[in-house]
Amino acid sequence: MRPTARKIGKWTAELLLVFIGAYAAFWLNSYQERHRDAQRRDVLLASLEEDVRGSIGVAHERAEKLGQDAAAFRAKVDAGEMPPLYPFVFITDYNPTDVATLLQAGGVELLDPKTLAALRKVESRVRAWLGLMERYQKLSDQLIVPNVDQGPEFFYDPATKKLRKRFEKYPQSLEDAGKFFEEFEKLEKELLQQIQLERQKHK
C-alpha cells in the first residue's frame, strides 16, 4: 500500500472513531436527559395528583354544605319566614397563579398536551367563577355589611315577606357559591383521571 493510501486509511479510521465517540457521548447525554425528564415528570405528576385529590375532597364537602344552606334559606323565604341575611364571604384555597408557576417550572415541556389542556380548563373556569364571587362579595360589602344590625323589615317587604329588590340576588349568591364547588369538583375529577392516564403511559 502506498504511504498516501495508508495515511488516508489511518485518517479515515481516526475520523470514524471520533464520530463514534461523539455519537456515543451524544446518545449518553440524550439518555441521561430523558431519564432526568422522566424523573421530574413523575415527581410533578405525583405532587399534582396529591393536590388534586385533596381539592376534590374539600370541594365535595363545601358544595354539599353550601348547597344545603342555600336550599334552606330559599325554603324559609318561600315559606314567608324572612330569615336573616349575613355578609357574603367566599373562601377557596385555589389560586390560579399556582398553575402558571407549575408551567413555568417545566410543566409545559414535561406534561402531556391533554394534561395541560385539563389544567388550563380548570384555571379558566375557576377564574370566571372567582370573578362572579368577587362581585357578590362587593355587593354584600355595600348592602349587607353596613346594615347587618337592621331588623328584617330593612331587607324584606313586610307586606309580601319577599326580599326587597336590592337584596334579591342574595339567595342566588348562596346557590352560586355551592355551584362553584360542584363544578370545581367535576373539573378536578377530570384532571385527576388525565393525570393518572399520563402516569400510566410513562410507567
Regions found by a protein language model. Name each.
Residues 1-13:
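Short hydrophobic membrane-inserting helices
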